């Protein structure tokens, strides 16, 4: 399946926090045999959220949105999602009743309980704001522990595909292996090959759905590296 990840938050765009949520989900999805088509970061703006979610829902099989589900003034993601699908924002009775036992702040409880009409609730075991699913979009809290808790439940819904990965470490600079690497890329179109330079060495990752094709590409690359001609 193809996924698009949308991270919502002014604090990400300003550089105040690092977007670890997107990296976490992308890695999990990839290793489950899925493809992440793109990762988008957008501000806490209802209109932008609505526009980007509407577009993403048409481009991908499923969309994962994080951030903006709390009780403060800038938590507007639920409203943006509702607008994206022309749905009313309604109070989830089950969420409202549960939160009312935890807090006497009526305004906060009502805001966190508000979801697009027809949403399915995904309970958050480590925080107040639950996730919800509407059409082909899942919306999760932005706090990493809460995102991980709800994301794992959502990920279980999708059948795992084949995924195989091997990594080769090459000492020296990337420029030394470019020609050989390009040859392997040309010869192995079904294998995704990434080159990641580090101080003093390069990590080359080979991945794909077919284990034998991945191994074949790795073998070819290692043979080319050993060929000193």
From Swiss-Prot:
It holds the Pfam family FLAD1_M. SUPFAM superfamilies: Molybdenum cofactor biosynthesis proteins. Gene3D superfamilies: MoaB/Mog-like domain. InterPro entries: CinA, CinA_Arc, FLAD1_M, MoaB/Mog-like_dom_sf, MoaB/Mog_dom. Belongs to the CinA family. This is Protein AF_2251. It comes from Archaeoglobus fulgidus (strain ATCC 49558 / DSM 4304 / JCM 9628 / NBRC 100126 / VC-16). The lineage of its organism: Archaea, Methanobacteriati, Methanobacteriota, Archaeoglobi, Archaeoglobales.
